[in-house]
């Protein structure tokens, strides 16, 4: 099953990644997700760089709000709060994403909390919550995929959310590169995949 966010214009030199208007997403990830999430991601524009890039999608926000927990995950999964928070985040509803993340006392909850503040340009707060996460969920896989798409990520010995925050902060002045979009898409997809496959972080 292929996962397309929008009509593909080109293929990334990194195997398995395809380019769309808003970034990169591997085509084989549908196997990791429930039917609800797979369909949600087909309609979403990933990654989210800021509240306005891409614009919030009110229809997807409503879908994330109205779906039952079991509908989202397809089975019992204690990470459903984190998963719903990520769906709100990518749809552009930061208040709901923040509300859910701050109520979840896990590494994943803290990490998503940091992602929300990073999107909202509150970089100091983002770094605080990345530190609170202690360990990054699925960090090794996040690094493996992102390093293949980014010289900047590959220059570090492991996944570094602070370095990624620096990249995002710099993009507010220098503009958003395809490299940054690829890195943020990998971050989102690996974290979501991890949460869907496990029941705790």
Where are these regions (language model features)?
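Conserved alpha-helical segments that form or flank metal/cofactor-binding pockets of metalloenzymes
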Residues: 123-132
């Amino acid at each position: 099953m292929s996962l397309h966010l929008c009509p593909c214009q080109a293929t990334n030199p990194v195997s398995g990644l395809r380019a769309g208007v808003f970034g990169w997403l591997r085509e084989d990830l549908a196997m990791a997700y429930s039917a609800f999430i797979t369909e949600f991601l087909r309609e979403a524009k990933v990654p989210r760089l800021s509240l306005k890039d891409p614009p919030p999608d009110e229809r997807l926000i409503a879908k994330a709000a109205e779906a039952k927990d079991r509908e989202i995950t397809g089975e019992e999964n204690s990470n459903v709060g984190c998963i719903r928070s990520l769906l709100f985040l990518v749809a552009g509803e930061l208040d709901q994403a923040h509300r859910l993340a701050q109520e979840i006392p896990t590494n994943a909850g803290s990490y998503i909390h940091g992602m929300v503040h990073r999107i909202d340009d509150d970089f100091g707060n983002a770094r605080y919550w990345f530190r609170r996460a202690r360990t990054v969920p699925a960090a090794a896989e996040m690094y493996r995929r992102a390093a293949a798409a980014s010289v900047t990520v590959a220059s570090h010995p492991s996944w570094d959310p602070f370095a990624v925050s620096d990249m995002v902060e710099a993009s507010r002045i220098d503009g958003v590169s395809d490299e940054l979009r690829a890195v943020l898409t990998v971050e989102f997809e690996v974290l979501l995949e991890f949460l869907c496959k496990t029941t705790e972080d």
